[in-house]
Structures are given as C-alpha cells and as structure tokens.
Regions:
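Substrate-recognition/cap helix-loop segment adjacent to the acidic, metal-dependent catalytic center
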Residues: 102-122
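Conserved non-catalytic scaffold segment of RNase H-like nuclease domains
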Residues: 2-104
Length: 123
C-alpha cells in the first residue's frame, strides 16, 4: 500500500462570489503529489499545471500566492487529461492523504474507486 500526499492549487472567480460559476466555484490549476511507500519514504513525485477553461483571469489571492501568469497555463493540458495522468501515476493500491480536507471536495467528481480517502481532519 502506498500513500499519495496530495496538494491542489486552484483559482476562483476574480469578480466575486456573485459572478462565480455555481457549478464550479473553484477550478484546479495544478495537481501536485508525492508518493510514499509503507515506510513513509518518498518514492516518486507528480506535478502538472492545468489549463483553465472557466476562470481565465486570476483571483487576486490566487495570483499573490502562486506567482503564475495565465500565460504560464495557456498551453497546458486540460483538467481531464491531467487527471487521467495523475490517476495512472497513483497506481493500483493507495491511500490519499492531504493537509487540507477541501482538496477532496474540489476533486469530488473524480474520486478513485480503487482507493480510500484519508484526511487529517477526520482524526
């Protein structure tokens, strides 16, 4: 069994909550993860930027945290393409871990049926 420590970066509507896409209030723009073995040793890393399709301008807070420009993302792969590569990288048997439970809600349309979700917030 391996552990996938997940870190997501996302953007949101730059014009405020009133104008956000209610079906997609947060858009993932980066998936990062490390894979740990049963001894909790790092055995691999994953990091891919994602081309945004909903919010094509950064929210001011996102911009201040990530130090990216939209030019950095314009030629990247779409979320479904990156997610497919990420799940393939995860392998067959793993447990997702994260420092922040919100990552799982952001990914919720794309859960893995072969894995358990574990968050420090449930302990």
């Amino acid at each position: 069994m391996e552990f996938i420590v997940l870190d997501l970066e996302w953007n949101q509507c730059p014009y405020g909550k009133e104008k956000e896409n209610k079906k997609l209030p947060f858009e993932i723009i980066e998936i990062g993860a490390v894979k740990l073995n049963s001894k909790r040793e790092c055995i691999d890393k994953f990091s891919m930027l994602v081309k945004p399709t909903v919010y094509r301008e950064f929210h001011y807070y996102t911009k201040s945290m990530l130090h990216l420009s939209m030019k950095d993302l314009k030629d990247k792969e779409s979320f479904p393409e990156v997610m497919e590569k990420f799940l393939k990288w995860c392998g067959e048997e793993y447990i997702f871990c994260t420092f922040y439970y919100f990552s799982f809600f952001t990914l919720s349309p794309y859960p893995s049926s072969s894995s358990d979700f574990v968050s420090d917030s449930i302990y």
